[in-house]
Amino acid sequence: QLENCVYDFFELTSLNMAQQGVFGDVLHVEGSYIHNLEDFWPSYWNNWRMDYNQKHRGDVYATHGMGPACQVLNIHRGDRMKTLVSMDTKAVNGPAYIKKQTGEEVKDFQNGDQTSTLIRTENGKTMLIQHNVMTPRPYSRMYQIVGADGYASKYPIEEYCLRPTQVDSNDVPN
């Protein structure tokens, strides 16, 4: 895997838990790249990042969210992505930033402020991937796993929720 987010401790721990069956059948995974870049826009060489968002539409940085999600769903290891629907909002903050910096009115800004992509796999599982670098949302990669028997979430706090299991009273010491 070339995506660095698959190597974070929480992602690796959750992947191991999923592979061990702790969450039961994994049904849905979420991931994203949400990062308010307002303070960083001037730092990008030749304004490359804003320029790319102005000229291209869609989730232009899907790998942070998709890498860990694909690992948990066993994409290309028994399952594959089959159906994809992606939508974005209108562009508000990108054109406003350019106008503030240059005085230039931008009418053809391509990428919306928020892009959401929903993917269904061959085996009937779903994945939601989001991209948002234009609004004041706090940083998040939204990593979430929804299983038949458990749940994991990394942002805004790391948490696990597992279905309680029935324990035979003879196995529990008093």
Across the structure, where does each feature detected by a protein language model lie?
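A short, structured loop/turn motif at beta-sheet edges
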Residues: 23, 120-123
